[in-house]
């Protein structure tokens, strides 16, 4: 997910996307710990997506 895509979304949409990504991160961590995760790059990708969403949320909050 690109930052430009996130900038176009509303705060409510960003919060919903953040919850979705946090759930995905939890599931990936559980799969990794049990040895079921084959695509380990998804953990890093999800973590960075969460950081991007949080950054955009903070930027939007600072402009208000």
UniProtKB/Swiss-Prot annotation:
Q: What Gene3D superfamilies would the database entry show?
A: 1.10.287.310
Name any GO cellular component annotation. Answer: cytosolic large ribosomal subunit
List GO BP terms, alphabetically: translation
Q: Which domain of life is it from?
A: Bacteria
One GO term in the molecular function aspect is:
structural constituent of ribosome
Q: Which UniProt keywords apply?
A: Ribonucleoprotein, Ribosomal protein
Is-annotated flag, keyword Ribonucleoprotein?
yes
Q: Give the family this protein belongs to, as stated in its UniProt record.
A: Belongs to the universal ribosomal protein uL29 family.
Question: What's the name of the protein?
Answer: Large ribosomal subunit protein uL29
State the organism of origin.
Teredinibacter turnerae (strain ATCC 39867 / T7901)
At the highest ranks, the source species' classification is: Bacteria, Pseudomonadati, Pseudomonadota, Gammaproteobacteria, Cellvibrionales
């Amino acid at each position: 997910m690109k930052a430009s895509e996130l900038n176009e979304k509303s705060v409510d949409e960003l919060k919903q996307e953040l919850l979705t990504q946090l759930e995905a991160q939890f599931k990936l961590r559980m799969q990794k710990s049990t040895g079921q995760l084959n695509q380990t790059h998804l953990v890093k990708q999800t973590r960075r997506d969460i950081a991007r969403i949080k950054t955009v949320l903070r930027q939007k909050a600072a402009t208000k």
